[in-house]
């Protein structure tokens, strides 16, 4: 499944909406997403599963690129 992760680049600062970034990652579950991203200095705000029409819509974005991280 593909997940969209909303995050802040600096894990030590309070989240500011204008600085929120996104990435796409393939994983089994939200827990798997967190496990794959642990060790990165980011502050995960929200993990959104993408499927169906929503996934197709996101694929049309020029920023859609699935991050490849092995388990």
Swiss-Prot record:
The reaction(s) this protein catalyses: RNA(n) + a ribonucleoside 5'-triphosphate = RNA(n+1) + diphosphate
GO cellular component, one term: DNA-directed RNA polymerase complex
InterPro entries, sorted: RpoY
Taxonomic superkingdom: Bacteria
Enzyme class, broadest EC rank: transferase
Gene Ontology BP terms: DNA-templated transcription
Sorted UniProt keywords: DNA-directed RNA polymerase, Nucleotidyltransferase, Transcription, Transferase
Documented EC number(s): 2.7.7.6
Gene Ontology molecular function, alphabetical: DNA binding; DNA-directed RNA polymerase activity
Coiled-coil region(s): none
Subunit structure, as described in the record: RNAP is composed of a core of 2 alpha, a beta and a beta' subunit. The core is associated with a delta subunit, and at least one of epsilon or omega. When a sigma factor is associated with the core the holoenzyme is formed, which can initiate transcription.
Family of this protein: Belongs to the RNA polymerase subunit epsilon family.
Function of the protein: A non-essential component of RNA polymerase (RNAP).
HAMAP family xrefs: RNApol_bact_RpoY (MF_01553)
Protein name, UniProt field: DNA-directed RNA polymerase subunit epsilon
Gene (UniProt): rpoY
